[in-house]
Amino acid sequence: LDPKCTLPLETGICRAELHRFGYDTKLKECTQFVYGGCHHNENNFKKLEVCR
């Protein structure tokens, strides 16, 4: 498992509603979440295929 995938899913503090994907360590799979548009970590992908 890539270390960046163990980072928490961060929605960010801004108010955009962008659909992104990140690895959820509890579910052990990539899931979709709403990203606010700023302040994120590396566990934030535009496409599901890139998250895997």
Curated annotation (Swiss-Prot):
Up-regulation conditions: By infection.
SUPFAM superfamilies: BPTI-like
Molecular function as annotated in GO: serine-type endopeptidase inhibitor activity
Keyword hit for Disulfide bond: yes
Family annotation (InterPro entries): Kunitz_BPTI (IPR002223), Kunitz_BPTI_sf (IPR036880), Prtase_inh_Kunz-CS (IPR020901), TFPI/VKTCI-like (IPR050098)
Keywords assigned by UniProt, alphabetized: Disulfide bond, Protease inhibitor, Serine protease inhibitor
Matching Pfam families: Kunitz_BPTI (PF00014)
GO CC annotation: extracellular space
Disulfide feature: 14-38, 30-51
Function: Inhibits trypsin and the toxin protease PR2 of M.anisopliae. Does not inhibit chymotrypsin, subtilisin Carlsberg, proteinase K, porcine pancreatic elastase and the toxin protease PR1 of M.anisopliae.
Protein name: Inducible serine protease inhibitor 2
Source organism of this protein record: Galleria mellonella
